């Protein structure tokens, strides 16, 4: 089935149906204002009509309108609209499915025409259709047709008649006559722009072949609502939209065939059923002891009617339809008549629950449509489905019990009516009344708790008997008894379903973490499901066992997190000690084709409700590739693991379900000590990261203490970061002035404070690329995103020994077992094994030195000394080749070190360690695969590396121009604040070889408007470093390098023009990327014409900078533009032809620039007069937003659009 058509249609249909319902409600005088307040018009009776506001209706509509008003007041306008919109959407989808399958009794299409687009077949056959649907009105309907101008009214009557006719077979979907929703059936149904047209025209008929189309329609119908509520605390009425997901058919088959089908095959192993179930998994070969245990619990025979299957979160019924197929095959095998089977299955075998009325409607419909394929008379048999939407008990019990007159103590229509209430209360000691009271008490929050509500099994027989009596009263009782029975049946039926015990519980349960749960649900989870409270899916997983018979099967697809996360460790322990894993298809990400990305990672499994610790389950590792590959790999039994005993999982710390690990590897955890409490969690700022953390280049170097001496404001903090081993990711600093006084005022959690500033190791807690650990020198703090490891007093292990272990293949593989999700929590890392070895310690020290040298090559390190290319004289090409040689040596050295570490560990362990993704990745920027990824060719690697290296050289050159760096001194030279002390540095000779700019303002122009712009100074920098002799050669190498990746080559351009083009179009982008949107050179820009742009060094900015920018650059440039415009006008007077066209184009461009710059000058003068000062401690994000739209990319940096003046 191609779901693209449905995906496009259904969300729009929801909006269209909602709009249509709102429009109809408006005509009925029911509306809401913008704040959601109800506005109800008074009903004014005028003869045989009633007026609601401005609209007239027949008087007969009044009772139904009043019911709508009541619902609007009780539920709220929005809920009423949503409910009525999906009611009509569901009904019309159902009729569309039935007409295409020929299931409507009269045999004609209701919503379409087989031959004439936009027509309705029923209007061509009014006598026959009227006879079938509305025989008492046949004459009137035929007359309407003959009149020739009443097709709209006629069609409306026929459609409502069809709904009434379907009520008898599907009362859950089609209400009886006088349903108030009929008033909201949209108008203009026969027009070409009717609301019906999308349903008929937008979804091809072939997409309606399978009943699962109903499920897809529903999923996409609620998709926008789902997007709107995801990530928020979810109200009870929004739980369905937030938690429902349509399960792919192949996953459903796997679950049903290995639970319902397996139940049959255990007793009848030679059954032909096995050949019909392509996803059935044969058990692994078991030991004789396990085989004997299985034989002892396997029943000798099974009657098909006795097999009970429950989906406790049935949605639109996809799982139940597959259960129907398997059960049908079982009945057929036993020789039942084909036409008898559907009713037997629907009434005896299949049970479904959901909190969503819509979904339960569609689920019931799907089951009846399946049954209709096998029994053409099924819709007339009065089948009693066991699929219900859970309802909350909001009844007036005394009133209902009185009406029910269950024990026949009251005489209707006599003086007994005067004492009804007293009589009812006098009979409250009956078993049925007590049962009713305690049952209704369970369902006060049914729309929130759903199938998690626990009904005592001992009530099952009494509930069934009570239910049967209610069914009889609903048919045979007096008017009040029928009404009361009808009210009570849903509650007693849902309680009876939850009180039973099943052979198989099969589900795709709702997913919702604690953050999304409302207060009631969260409290319920804590009390009832302490081991699985972290997510709804886990609670359903655990609760399902209480709904099973002993030895029944729990089969679900849910999030894989329960297999690994420490928050589910108790749940795993309970499962391993009390249940038996049978089979699992570990699906990972992208198993649901409708969901992209890595967030939703799933696993499908079947677990038996008994315990056999020595059982060997069958696992399939299907975590790679897309849905189609996963499906095919399962069909072909690829990546199968079936040699691990269930008890083996308990040998791994935390008992993760790491089925792919070898036994030797699993046993290594028993032999080695764990890292333990050396691993500690870091601080958190209480949600104020933007207040307390900065990237280190943002602040003055005078207020930043890299050694943790304690007399500064800003200190380094380990905060995780990208995958990197050994050393690096030193990017952030934290305000820890006066022992963190401001943090403490903010109620920050300063965990493990005694470890601050100590030497240790740190890792990234949340990482999509694997586990790695870095050396953390003295002087650092660490937060919860970059938790840390420290050696204890008198520790036999050094931090270097630990780092060698943590960066080995062994730990990388261990991490994939213990926490193969995105999180490496402190609790998880404490479980990692460690190995003491002196050689490992020495190798780690060398690895740290190499990684540190690699990290410090770049100006984003605070230990950066100078650009490596300037270390070599001669020419830039030779410098680049030498630099590449230096990088290659670093890479080769680290390769050998890591290889030696892994060899030593493998020798100690006595087995080879499997390589996992990134476990052998050398995390140096010198390694082009690490730096750029594996997707590019070697030539692209080389070109990109050369281009990037030259871009870094230009950045360093700009730094020298600004005075941040100097050719005369290594490291940071000026990174203070407000230009203070700069003149003194210059006077000392700090910039003797290559003078820094006087004011820290560098014009960045696309043409040569200033002699000292950035381009001319880059040229001067190259001349200064490599000499005059090779200047042109060096400029050409630089230009050629930039055109390899940074910018595209341009014909006929000189080397300096290429460099200018890079600086004016790409340098700022590269700078933003290098400094992670916290630039230190700010780009002042006049706008899209680029009439004027300049860079200003953040650390040299002061309150006179804008005035100087204006007087030294902007005002003179305005004069030059005007002079050039005048010159071009003079030349145009004498030019003609192509020359005139060229001159005009040049002049017009200058006029645009002049106009833009004049406007910019006005704004610049306004801000210059304000003499704005900045405090570097506030950070770039705050300071960059103080200059309105004078700067480029304000929103990208600050998160807010610039203020206009």
Swiss-Prot record:
Keyword Methyltransferase: yes
Gene3D superfamilies: Vaccinia Virus protein VP39
Induction: Transcribed at slowly increasing levels as cells progress from lag to exponential to stationary phase.
Enzyme's top EC category: transferase
Listed Pfam families: Eco57I
Regulation: (Microbial infection) Methyltransferase activity is inhibited by phage T7 protein OCR (AC P03775, gene 0.3). Viability of cells overexpressing OCR is unaffected.
A GO term, aspect molecular function: nucleic acid binding
SUPFAM superfamilies per UniProt: S-adenosyl-L-methionine-dependent methyltransferases (SSF53335)
GO BP annotations listed: defense response to virus; DNA modification; methylation
Role: BREX systems (bacteriophage exclusion) provide immunity against bacteriophage. Part of a type 1 BREX system which protects against dsDNA phage. This system allows phage adsorption but prevents phage DNA replication, without degradation of the phage DNA. Methylation of bacterial DNA by this protein guides self/non-self discrimination. Methylates the adenine in the fifth position of the hexamer 5'-GGTAAG-3' in genomic DNA; methylates the same sequence in the few phage that escape the BREX system. Methylated phage are now resistant to BREX, showing immunity is provided by an epigenetic modification. Expression of this protein alone has no effect on phage infection, does not lead to methylated DNA and mildly inhibits growth.
Protein name: Adenine-specific methyltransferase BrxX
Gene responsible for this protein: pglX
């Amino acid at each position: 089935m191609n779901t693209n058509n449905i995906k496009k249609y259904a969300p729009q249909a929801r909006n269209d149906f909602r709009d249509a319902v709102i429009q109809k409600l408006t005509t009925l005088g029911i509306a809401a204002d913008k704040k959601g307040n109800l506005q109800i018009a008074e009903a004014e009776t005028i003869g045989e009509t009633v007026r609601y506001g401005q609209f007239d209706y027949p008087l007969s509509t009044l009772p139904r309108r009043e019911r709508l008003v009541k619902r609007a007041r009780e539920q709220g306008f929005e809920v009423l609209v949503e409910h009525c919109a999906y009611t009509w959407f569901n009904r019309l989808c159902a009729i569309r499915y039935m007409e295409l399958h020929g299931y409507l009794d009269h045999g004609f299409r209701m919503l379409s025409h087989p031959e004439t687009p936009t027509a309705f077949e029923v209007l061509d056959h009014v006598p026959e259709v009227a006879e079938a649907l509305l025989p008492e009105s046949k004459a009137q309907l035929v007359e309407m047709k003959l009149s020739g101008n009443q097709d709209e009214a006629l069609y409306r009557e026929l459609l409502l008649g069809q709904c009434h006719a379907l009520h008898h077979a599907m009362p859950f979907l089609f209400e009886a006559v006088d349903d108030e929703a009929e008033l909201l059936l949209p108008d203009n149904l026969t027009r070409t722009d009717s609301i019906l047209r999308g349903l008929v025209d937008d979804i091809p008929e072939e997409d309606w072949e399978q009943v699962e189309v109903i499920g897809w329609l529903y999923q996409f119908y609620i998709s926008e609502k789902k997007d709107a509520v995801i990530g928020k605390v979810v109200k009870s009425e929004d739980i369905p939209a937030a938690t429902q997901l349509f399960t792919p058919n192949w996953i459903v088959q796997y679950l049903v065939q290995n639970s319902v089908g397996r139940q049959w095959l255990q007793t009848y192993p030679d059954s032909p059923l096995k050949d019909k179930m392509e996803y059935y998994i044969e058990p692994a070969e078991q030991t004789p002891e396990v085989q004997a245990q299985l034989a002892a619990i396997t029943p000798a025979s099974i009657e098909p009617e006795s097999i009970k299957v429950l989906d406790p979160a049935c949605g639109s019924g996809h799982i139940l339809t597959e259960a129907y197929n398997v059960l049908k095959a079982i009945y057929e095998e036993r020789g039942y008549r084909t036409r008898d089977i559907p009713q037997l299955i629907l009434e005896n075998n299949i049970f479904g629950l959901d909190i969503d009325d819509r979904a339960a409607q569609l689920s019931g419909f799907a089951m009846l449509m399946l049954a209709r394929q096998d029994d053409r008379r099924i819709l007339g048999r009065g089948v009693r489905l066991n699929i219900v939407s859970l309802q909350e008990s909001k009844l007036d019990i005394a009133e209902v019990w009185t009406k029910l007159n269950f024990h026949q103590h009251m005489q209707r229509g006599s003086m007994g009516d005067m004492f009804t209430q007293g009589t009812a209360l006098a009979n409250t000691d009956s078993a049925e009344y007590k049962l009713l009271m305690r049952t209704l008490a369970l369902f006060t929050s049914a729309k929130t708790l759903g199938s998690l509500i626990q009904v005592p099994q001992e009530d099952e027989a009494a509930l069934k008997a009570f239910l049967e009596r209610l069914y009889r009263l609903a048919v045979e009782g007096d008017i009040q008894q029928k009404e009361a029975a009808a009210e009570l049946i849903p509650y007693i039926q849902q309680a009876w379903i939850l009180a039973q015990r099943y052979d198989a519980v099969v589900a795709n349960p709702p997913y919702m973490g604690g953050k999304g749960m409302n207060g009631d649900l969260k409290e319920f989870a804590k009390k009832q499901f302490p081991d699985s409270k972290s997510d709804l899916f886990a609670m359903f997983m655990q609760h399902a066992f209480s709904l099973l018979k002993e030895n029944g099967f729990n089969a679900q697809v849910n999030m894989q997190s329960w297999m690994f996360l420490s928050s589910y460790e108790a749940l795993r322990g309970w499962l391993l000690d009390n249940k038996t894993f049978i089979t699992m298809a570990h699906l990972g990400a992208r198993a649901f084709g409708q969901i992209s990305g890595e967030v939703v990672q799933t696993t499908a499994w079947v677990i038996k409700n008994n315990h056999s610790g020595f059982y060997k389950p069958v696992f399939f590792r299907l975590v790679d590739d897309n849905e189609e590959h996963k499906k095919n790999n399962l069909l072909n039994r690829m990546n199968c693991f079936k040699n691990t005993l269930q008890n083996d999982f308990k040998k791994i710390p935390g008992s993760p379900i790491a089925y792919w690990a070898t036994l030797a590897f699993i046993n290594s955890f028993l032999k080695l000590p764990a890292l333990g409490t050396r691993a500690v969690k870091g601080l958190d700022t209480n949600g104020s990261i933007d207040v307390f953390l900065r990237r280190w280049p943002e602040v003055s170097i005078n207020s930043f203490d890299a050694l943790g001496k304690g007399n500064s404001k800003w200190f380094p903090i380990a905060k995780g970061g990208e995958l990197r081993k050994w050393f690096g990711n030193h990017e952030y600093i934290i305000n820890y002035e006066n022992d963190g006084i401001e943090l403490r005022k903010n109620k920050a959690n300063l965990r493990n404070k005694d470890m601050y500033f100590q030497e240790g190791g740190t890792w990234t807690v949340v990482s999509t690329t694997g586990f790695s650990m870095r050396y953390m020198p003295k002087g650092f703090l660490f937060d919860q995103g970059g938790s840390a490891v420290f050696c204890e007093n008198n520790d036999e292990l050094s931090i270097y020994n630990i780092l060698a272990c943590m960066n080995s293949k062994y730990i990388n593989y261990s991490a994939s077992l213990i926490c193969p999700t995105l999180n490496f929590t402190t609790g998880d890392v404490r479980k990692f094994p460690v190995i003491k070895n002196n050689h490992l310690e020495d190798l780690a020290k060398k690895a740290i030195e190499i990684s540190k040298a690699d990290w410090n090559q770049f100006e984003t390190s605070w230990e950066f000394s100078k650009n490596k290319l300037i270390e070599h004289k001669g020419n830039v090409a030779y410098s680049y080749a030498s630099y590449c040689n230096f990088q290659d040596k670093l890479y080769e050295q680290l390769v050998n070190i890591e290889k030696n570490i892994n060899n030593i560990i493998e020798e100690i362990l006595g087995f080879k360690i499997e390589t996992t993704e990134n476990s052998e990745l050398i995390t140096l920027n010198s390694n082009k695969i690490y730096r750029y990824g594996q997707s590019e060719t070697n030539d692209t690697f080389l070109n990109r590396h050369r281009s990037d290296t030259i871009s870094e050289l230009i950045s360093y050159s700009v730094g020298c121009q600004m005075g941040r760096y100097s050719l005369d001194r290594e490291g940071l030279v000026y990174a203070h604040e407000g230009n203070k002390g700069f003149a003194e540095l210059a006077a000392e000779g700090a910039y003797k070889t290559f003078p820094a700019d006087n004011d820290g303002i560098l014009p960045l122009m696309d043409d040569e408007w200033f002699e000292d712009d950035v381009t001319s100074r880059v040229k001067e920098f190259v001349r200064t470093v490599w000499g005059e002799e090779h200047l042109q050669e060096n400029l050409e190498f630089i230009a050629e390098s930039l055109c390899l990746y940074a910018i595209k080559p341009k014909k006929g351009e000189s080397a300096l023009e290429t460099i200018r083009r890079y600086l004016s179009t790409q340098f700022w982008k590269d700078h933003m990327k290098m400094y992670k949107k916290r630039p230190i050179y700010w780009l002042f820009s006049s706008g899209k014409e680029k009439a004027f742009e300049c860079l200003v060094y953040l650390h040299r900015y002061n309150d006179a900078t804008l005035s100087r920018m204006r007087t030294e650059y902007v005002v003179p440039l305005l004069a030059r533009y005007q002079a050039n415009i005048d010159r071009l006008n003079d030349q145009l007077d004498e030019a003609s032809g192509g020359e005139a066209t060229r001159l005009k184009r040049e002049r017009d461009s200058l006029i645009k620039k002049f106009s833009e710059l004049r406007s910019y000058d006005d704004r610049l003068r306004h801000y210059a007069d304000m003499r704005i000062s900045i405090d570097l401690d506030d950070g770039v994000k705050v300071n960059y937003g103080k200059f309105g739209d004078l700067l480029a990319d304000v929103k990208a940096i600050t998160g807010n659009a610039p203020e206009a003046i």
